[in-house]
């Protein structure tokens, strides 16, 4: 497995690795996320999952639905709900673009990466995506296999 360069400007908390396999990502954008105090502490401890979540535009606002943030053990009184809907923060222009994108047939909003930026703010990268069919997934897998095989051949034979 090849090493990936790590960007010192942000720390990845959770990544939706299935998203790039299940969806064809057309465009992505960074959103802020409204969190409670215990949620931020839980994220810093690394307890989250965005693999089964999605974003939805409702009544002119963008929401992250079904994302999991583990309960923070030291929070006695102000505990948060693990799978509550969380509001995402985007500009009005970006909101209009997202709404127009979701109105097209087959388009959806998929969370890709949840991270802390260089200022320590929790951010989430949302992708405007179209679901792949099974044959598309097989084609992509075949291309990846072929490129790996080419790299091995070049490495072995010079």
Curated annotation (Swiss-Prot):
<dbReference type="GO" id="GO:0070929">
    <property type="term" value="P:trans-translation"/>
</dbReference>
<comment type="similarity">
    <text>Belongs to the SmpB family.</text>
</comment>
<comment type="function">
    <text>Required for rescue of stalled ribosomes mediated by trans-translation. Binds to transfer-messenger RNA (tmRNA), required for stable association of tmRNA with ribosomes. tmRNA and SmpB together mimic tRNA shape, replacing the anticodon stem-loop with SmpB. tmRNA is encoded by the ssrA gene; the 2 termini fold to resemble tRNA(Ala) and it encodes a 'tag peptide', a short internal open reading frame. During trans-translation Ala-aminoacylated tmRNA acts like a tRNA, entering the A-site of stalled ribosomes, displacing the stalled mRNA.</text>
</comment>
<dbReference type="GO" id="GO:0005829">
    <property type="term" value="C:cytosol"/>
</dbReference>
<dbReference type="InterPro" id="IPR000037">
    <property type="entry name" value="SsrA-bd_prot"/>
</dbReference>
<dbReference type="GO" id="GO:0003723">
    <property type="term" value="F:RNA binding"/>
</dbReference>
<protein>
    <recommendedName>
        <fullName>SsrA-binding protein</fullName>
    </recommendedName>
</protein>
<dbReference type="Pfam" id="PF01668">
    <property type="entry name" value="SmpB"/>
</dbReference>
<dbReference type="InterPro" id="IPR020081">
    <property type="entry name" value="SsrA-bd_prot_CS"/>
</dbReference>
<keyword id="KW-0694">RNA-binding</keyword>
<feature type="compositionally biased region" description="Basic and acidic residues">
    <location>
        <begin position="136"/>
        <end position="158"/>
    </location>
</feature>
<feature type="region of interest" description="Disordered">
    <location>
        <begin position="130"/>
        <end position="158"/>
    </location>
</feature>
<keyword id="KW-0963">Cytoplasm</keyword>
<dbReference type="InterPro" id="IPR023620">
    <property type="entry name" value="SmpB"/>
</dbReference>
């Amino acid at each position: 497995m090849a090493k990936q360069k790590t960007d010192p400007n942000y720390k990845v908390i959770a990544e939706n690795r299935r998203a790039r396999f299940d969806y064809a990502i057309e465009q992505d954008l960074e959103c802020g996320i409204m969190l409670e105090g215990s949620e931020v502490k839980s994220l810093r401890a690394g307890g989250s999952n965005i693999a089964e979540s999605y974003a939805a535009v409702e009544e002119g606002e963008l929401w992250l639905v079904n994302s999991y943030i583990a309960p923070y053990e030291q929070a006695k009184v102000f505990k948060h709900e693990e799978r509550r809907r969380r509001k995402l923060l985007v500009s009005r222009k970006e909101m209009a673009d997202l709404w127009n994108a979701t109105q097209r047939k087959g388009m959806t909003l998929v969370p890709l990466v949840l991270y802390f930026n260089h200022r320590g703010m929790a951010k989430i990268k949302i992708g405007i995506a179209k679901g792949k069919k099974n044959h598309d997934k097989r084609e992509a897998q075949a291309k990846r296999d072929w490129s790996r095989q080419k790299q091995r051949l070049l490495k072995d034979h010079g």
